Amino acid sequence: MHPVDIIRPRYPAAPSEFAELDSIFHTHVSHSLEKLHHELTRFIRQKNLSDAAKQAAMAVQLELQQQTSQARTHWIEAESSSSFSLFLKCLQIETFIQNAQFSAINQLLKTLPPMHQTDEPEALSYLAQSAVVCGLPSIVMRLVHALPASQENDGLMCATRVLQKTHTPETQLESQFLAVKNWLAQQGITIDCYGLMYSVIDDQLADLLIYVNERNIERLVCINTNLDNYLSDTFSQNLPTGISISVRSTLEIDVS
C-alpha cells in the first residue's frame, strides 16, 4: 500500500475584529440555524461595532436566507472596510458549504488574483487548500508564491502536482468533483467538509474525500455504490484510474 497523506482545508484563526462573529457562526451553524439567526441579529445591533464586522454579519445572515445577491453587496462592503479580506473570503466559503452552494465556492476561488505576498498566511493557505479539493490546481499555482513555508503547504503542493500529472483537463476535474457534491446535496446528505488523500510516492494517485455526518457503515457503502453508478451514468469520460471519489464518515477525521 502506498504511503498517503490528506489535505483538508484548515480554517484560519479569526482576526480580533471578527472573532465574536466567527464564534457565533461556528458555535451555532451545525446545531440551530434559528439560534444562529437570533445571535446574528443581536450582534448586528451592537453599538461600537466596526463597519466591516457589521457588514460581514449581515452578509452571513443573508447567505443563510439564500439571498445571495444581497449578501454579495455586504461582502464587498465588509472587504472594503477591513484589512482582512482573505479571512472574509474564508468565512464566505464556510457559509457556502452550509448552504451547499458548491459552485459558488468554485467561482469565488476563481476570482483570486495571482499573489506574491500576503499579510494573511493562514487564510491564504485555507483558500489554496480549498482550491485543490475543488479540483482547481491552477488556482493553487496563482497563490503558491505567497504561501508561507510549512510542512502543511509542502503537502498542498504535492497534492496539487498529483492532480496536474494525471494530465486530466482541469474543467473535467472541477466538473466531476462539483457534480458529486451537488448530487449528495440533492440526496439530502449534508456535507460537513472534504479533503484530498494523495500518494506520497506515486504522483498519479489521489482520492477526493467527502465527509458526511453518517455513522452507519452499511449506509455509507450504499451511498458510495449509488455515487459510482451516478458518475458512470452521467459522465461519458471517466476520471483517470488513479483519481477516485469516496464518501466517508466525519467520525474518521483525526481531531488530535
Tell what function each PLM region has.
Residues 16, 24-31, 35, 154, ...:
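Alpha-helix boundary/N-cap detector
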Residues 1-11, 20-24, 239-256:
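Catalytic core of pol beta-like nucleotidyltransferases
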Residues 14-152:
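Alpha-helical protein-protein interaction scaffolds
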Residues 1, 43, 93, 100-101, ...:
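Charge-rich, low-complexity amphipathic helices
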